[in-house]
């Protein structure tokens, strides 16, 4: 056998078999022949999966699935069902005197239900004469699905006095380019202009106070839109997948932006928020949009899950001082390069910056009390982090595979470091754990392949499995006197680890705790040691 560590373990196993429970503080070694004999007898297959397969294949997959599922995992939002439904009910109506329009009378008012075949430029009159009633009726409404799927309409002009447009009224009018609405229009119902793929020009009137979901989704040629202040809430998926939409202006009075409202607006570069009225941005509101920068007014207090996720062009963000938390996956998969978290933020939920591969700099406030798991998951460009004194816990997978992270400054009050918190941080060279820490979770510093020195203070009483797994350049380890158990696979595959002194507090050495430490020539074991597991 070629490895010194096998000599060491063979000696430990042989002597432990002869000396029950209590071992003196001695350095042990064994002759080559003894090592070969014992190792061949006791070296079984690993009884637990290695973190490289366990975390990368299982945890990483689960995390990615969780993030993509809540952070705009679909590349596009499917076209609403009613846009594909051949059974959409087209309204009945009777023709006008000139035969150009179809209508029905409801409560002494005319509703438009369609137009004559071949109509390209539609001008709707302000009144319609009904021959049966011998009366003029004001035109106030376009009925639901009135022009559904009409491929001939190109322009529509509505009269003064028009107050509403029904659901799906112009859905799928793929040649419609321009719509003129009067200031009297108050409501546009769901799907009204959905999939009008050539619509380039539409002005929403100041009178508008309601717009339903999907009203302008998949309007692929629409380039700009101004939302009037009377429209206090922007509906869900209202402009989703408007691929050419570049500019959005929200006038004072707009209070909330609905979920998926601008989802998939890949050309969207600028959103002008109102100064004081907007308070809420709902889930996935700008997911997969083309935004390059965001400046949220201080009136914004709530930004919901994944609101700006998958914004690959997003470089800079100014957060509102009115916010107290960052919700789950807010900027996951975005192109962020730097961000300063304001003092008002006390909580950062899971996955907020996960997979932000360009994120280099983050400033965390001293007011921060909670940072959940996977917040900086796989932020491969993050180089340094200063953790505030207000933070007591480093959560699981917090800096998982932040491969450029080379400088970590722990806060004065941190007491635990979670599982896989710094897993795969391959640019770290030294780990100095504060003397306030009592627990290191499983795989906390595993795969930190360039770490050469680790100091575990006396305050630490709990070292999890695999904690320093595969730290291939680790040579210098100091273990504090608070540790009683060197758990399974603790230093597994630390193949440059040469000399370790186990403190007097340790009573047990778990299986494979030093397995694969091929450079180890001696190990100091304390009188307190009660058991050594197989292949330790």
Place the predicted regions along the sequence by residue.
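Alpha-helix C-terminal capping segments
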Residues: 96, 286-287, 330-334
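Short intrinsically disordered, low-complexity segments
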Residues: 14, 18-21, 31-34, 38-41, ...
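Structural signature of tandem-repeat unit edges
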Residues: 105-108, 117-141, 151-164, 174-187, ...
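N-terminal capping/linker segments that flank leucine-rich repeat
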Residues: 2-19, 23-149, 155-160, 252, ...
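Consensus positions within tandem repeat domains that build extended binding/scaffold surfaces
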Residues: 144-146, 166-171, 189-194, 212-215, ...
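Sequence-pattern detector for short linear motifs
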Residues: 5, 9-10, 34-35, 67, ...
């Amino acid at each position: 056998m070629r490895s010194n560590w096998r000599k060491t373990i063979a000696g430990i196993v042989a002597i432990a078999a002869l000396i029950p429970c209590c071992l003196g503080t001695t350095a042990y070694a064994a002759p080559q022949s003894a090592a070969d004999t014992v190792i061949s007898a006791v070296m079984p297959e690993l009884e637990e999966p290695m973190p490289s397969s366990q975390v990368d294949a299982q945890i990483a997959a689960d995390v990615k699935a969780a993030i993509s599922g809540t952070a705009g995992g679909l590349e596009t939002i499917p076209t609403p069902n009613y846009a594909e439904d051949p059974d959409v009910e087209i309204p009945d109506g009777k023709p006008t005197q000139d035969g150009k329009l179809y209508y029905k009378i409801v409560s002494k008012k005319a509703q438009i239900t369609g137009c004559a075949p071949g109509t390209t430029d539609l001008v709707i009159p302000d009144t319609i004469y009904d021959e049966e009633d011998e009366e003029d009726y004001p035109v106030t409404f376009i009925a639901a699905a009135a022009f559904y799927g009409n491929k001939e309409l190109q322009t529509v002009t509505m009269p003064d006095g028009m107050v509403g447009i029904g659901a799906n009224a112009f859905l799928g009018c793929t040649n419609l380019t321009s719509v003129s609405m009067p200031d009297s229009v108050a409501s546009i119902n769901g799907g009204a202009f959905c999939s009008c793929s050539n619509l380039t020009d539409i002005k929403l009137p100041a009178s508008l106070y309601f717009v339903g979901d999907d009203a302008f989704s998949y309007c692929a040629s629409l380039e700009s839109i101004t939302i009037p202040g009377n429209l206090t809430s922007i509906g869900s998926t209202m402009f989703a997948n408007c691929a050419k939409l570049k500019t959005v202006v929200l006038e004072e009075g707009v209070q909330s932006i609905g979920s998926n409202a601008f989802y998939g607006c890949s050309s969207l570069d600028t959103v002008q928020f109102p100064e004081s009225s907007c308070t809420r941005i709902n889930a996935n509101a700008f997911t997969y949009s083309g935004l390059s920068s965001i400046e949220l007014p201080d009136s914004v207090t709530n930004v919901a899950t994944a609101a700006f996720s998958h914004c690959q062009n997003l470089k800079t963000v100014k957060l509102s001082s009115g916010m107290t938390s960052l919700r789950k996956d807010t900027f996951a998969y975005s192109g962020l390069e730097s961000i300063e978290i304001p003092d008002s933020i006390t909580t950062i939920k899971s996955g907020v910056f996960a997979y932000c591969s360009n994120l280099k700099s983050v400033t965390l406030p001293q007011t921060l009390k909670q940072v959940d798991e996977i917040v900086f998951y796989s932020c491969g460009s993050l180089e340094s982090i200063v953790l505030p004194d207000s933070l007591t816990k480093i959560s699981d997978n917090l800096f998982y595979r932040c491969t450029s992270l080379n400088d970590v400054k722990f806060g004065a009050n941190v007491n635990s470091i979670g599982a896989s918190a710094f897993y795969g941080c391959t640019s770290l060279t030294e780990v100095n754990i504060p003397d306030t820490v009592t627990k290191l979770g499983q795989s906390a510093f595993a795969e930190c392949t360039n770490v050469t020195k680790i100091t575990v203070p006396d305050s630490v009483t709990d070292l999890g499995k695999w904690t320093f797994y595969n730290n291939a350049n680790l040579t210098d380890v100091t273990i504090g006197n608070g540790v009683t158990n060197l758990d399974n696979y603790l230093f597994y595959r630390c193949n440059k680890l040469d000399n370790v002194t186990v403190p007097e507090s340790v009573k047990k050495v778990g299986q494979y705790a030093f397995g694969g430490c091929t450079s180890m020539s001696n190990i100091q074991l304390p009188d307190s040691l009660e058991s050594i597991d197989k292949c330790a």
